[in-house]
From Swiss-Prot:
It catalyses: N(6)-carboxybiotinyl-L-lysyl-[protein] + acetyl-CoA = N(6)-biotinyl-L-lysyl-[protein] + malonyl-CoA. The keyword Mitochondrion does not apply. Component of the acetyl coenzyme A carboxylase (ACC) complex. First, biotin carboxylase catalyzes the carboxylation of biotin on its carrier protein (BCCP) and then the CO(2) group is transferred by the carboxyltransferase to acetyl-CoA to form malonyl-CoA. Pathway: Lipid metabolism; malonyl-CoA biosynthesis; malonyl-CoA from acetyl-CoA: step 1/1. Acetyl-CoA carboxylase is a heterohexamer composed of biotin carboxyl carrier protein (AccB), biotin carboxylase (AccC) and two subunits each of ACCase subunit alpha (AccA) and ACCase subunit beta (AccD). The gene is accA. SUPFAM superfamilies: ClpP/crotonase (SSF52096). It is found in: Cytoplasm. HAMAP family: AcetylCoA_CT_alpha. The lineage of its organism: Bacteria, Bacillati, Cyanobacteriota, Cyanophyceae, Synechococcales. This is Acetyl-coenzyme A carboxylase carboxyl transferase subunit alpha. Its EC number is 2.1.3.15. Residues 40-294 form the CoA carboxyltransferase C-terminal domain. Keywords: ATP-binding, Cytoplasm, Fatty acid biosynthesis, Fatty acid metabolism, Lipid biosynthesis, Lipid metabolism, Nucleotide-binding, Transferase.
Length: 329
């Protein structure tokens, strides 16, 4: 069994992991019964891992959200979706690999599935542009959503991107316009939309497929208006202050649940989704089916009105009165 890469704050587990691997190797090479010792060490490692992950800072949660072995959109689709058929192209000559989609079946219900897709290694990440979609990707996503709306297919989106691609070519092709159209049109959809932040949800790149009736989020995922590194560079001219920015941005599931941005935070297996992806997939499937059943009981008008009201209720506008100005003076 290959060792999983450990994050910096998981280093206290290194010695335990090495001992576990040594005992497994001993069991493979001899007939010695080491099952009891192995079970004890694995239980100890699980307890320590749980203790570590219960006290993660926002900056550490970002590391978990970006873990290279964290389940991706395609991983989740393969876990709980039957008869998956990927659909390609935006009908303008582009087929962005950073944003994928297609039709599948969850249980007995046909659905449209759309999500950001990162790579597992450098070569695949380059091919998928590290999950940063170009305008063609968002136009492809909107084409698939229109298709779902026409055939009354519920839409499931999976958010996992550091942000929309901000290169010169993307700007020339209308990146801002493509995302803006998606925001407008998603409010008009007549079918249920459930979005899940499975990794990192960055800025407009996440919002481009994130206007949903229900927004779910894994507990070690993050959802933010800008990456902490970018925020620190803008505010303090120092990317090293990213941990401070991460805390100030309130990017965690608990914070966003309190703010009314997300509707449910899904628990992750001890150590994060990368340690037990199948368990994570079952948790996500159960949550999606539960919310989908609730949304399908609403009429088209109720669905759209509730979606609009949900986003209108987010945030507050604070304006100083003349009395406040006088007091400050």
């Amino acid at each position: 069994m290959p060792r999983r890469p450990l994050l910096e704050f998981e280093k206290p587990l290194v010695e335990l992991e090495q001992q576990i691997e040594q005992i497994r190797q001993l069991a493979r090479d001899s007939e010695v019964d080491v099952s009891q010792q192995l079970q004890q060490l694995e239980s100890l490692a699980a307890r320590r891992r749980q203790e570590i992950f219960q006290g993660l800072t926002p900056a550490q949660k970002i590391q978990v959200a970006r873990h290279p072995q964290r389940p991706s959109t395609l991983d989740f689709i393969q876990m709980f979706c039957d008869d998956w058929v990927e659909l390609h192209g935006d009908r303008r000559g582009n087929d962005d690999q950073a944003l994928i989609g297609g039709v599948g079946r969850v249980g007995n219900r046909a659905v449209m599935l759309i999500g950001h897709q990162k790579g597992r290694d450098t070569k695949e990440n380059v091919a998928r542009n590290f999950g940063m979609a170009a305008p063609g990707g968002y136009r492809k996503a909107m084409r698939l959503m229109d298709h779902a709306d026409r055939f009354r297919l519920p839409i499931l989106t999976f958010i996992d991107t550091p942000g929309a691609y901000a290169g010169l070519e993307a700007e020339e092709q209308g990146q801002g316009e493509a995302i803006a159209v998606n925001l407008r049109e998603m409010f008009r959809l007549r079918v249920p939309v459930i979005a899940t932040v499975i990794g990192e949800g960055g800025s407009g790149g996440a919002l481009g497929i994130g206007v949903a009736d229900r927004l779910l989020m894994f507990e070690h995922s993050v959802y933010t208006v800008a990456s902490p590194e970018a925020c620190a560079s803008i505010l303090w001219r120092d990317a090293a202050k990213a941990p401070d920015a991460a805390a100030a941005l309130r990017i965690t599931g608990r914070d966003l649940l309190e703010l009314g941005v997300v509707d449910e935070v899904l628990e992750e297996p001890s150590g994060g989704n990368n340690w037990a992806p199948l368990e994570a997939g079952e948790n996500l499937r159960a949550a999606i089916e539960r919310h989908l059943e609730q949304l399908l009981s609403l009429s088209e008008q109720q669905l759209r009105e509730a979606r609009y009201s949900k986003f209108r209720a987010m945030g507050r506008f604070l304006e100083k009165t003349s009395q406040d100005v006088d007091k400050a003076a």
